[in-house]
Amino acid sequence: MKKPLSHYELFLCLEESILKAHSLDEYGINSFQRQHIKHRAFFLMKFDVLLDLYRKSNNSKADHLHGKNAAIVMCCEKLRISPIEAKKFSLDDIITTLHTDINNLNLASEVMDDIRNPYQSDIPEMEYSQHQLGSFIDAEWDPELRYRLTSRASY
């Protein structure tokens, strides 16, 4: 049975993953750090939405194009490399490869009603996120999160 996925729910889970990956206590961080974490969670949520939209745009291959598989295929297409090479990519490598697509993704207005970009900045989103937290680490994003939350999510 499909259960609709709230973008806010995904955002909160990503925020929790980031805190855990960096061994940070939600109540032990200052407001400046909190903004960086929220900004990064927003960016990773957009990344996850981009991958899901990519999967849906490839209907004939949709069953295997989810999570990291979709990211690998997108990196292969963008860089014209083999899947064997792309499978070695870390989350930071994938984000670096796809950052323009992520930044350019426009989320639906109903998504933005629930989640606002928590910190407006002239710095490109990826650079802003890396300023405080460093490079993206694999533990920040669980490629199967969407499916665990929804048991085959739908938008």
Predicted regions and their residues:
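An amphipathic, hydrophobic-aromatic interaction surface with interspersed Lys/Arg
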Residues: 1-120, 147-155
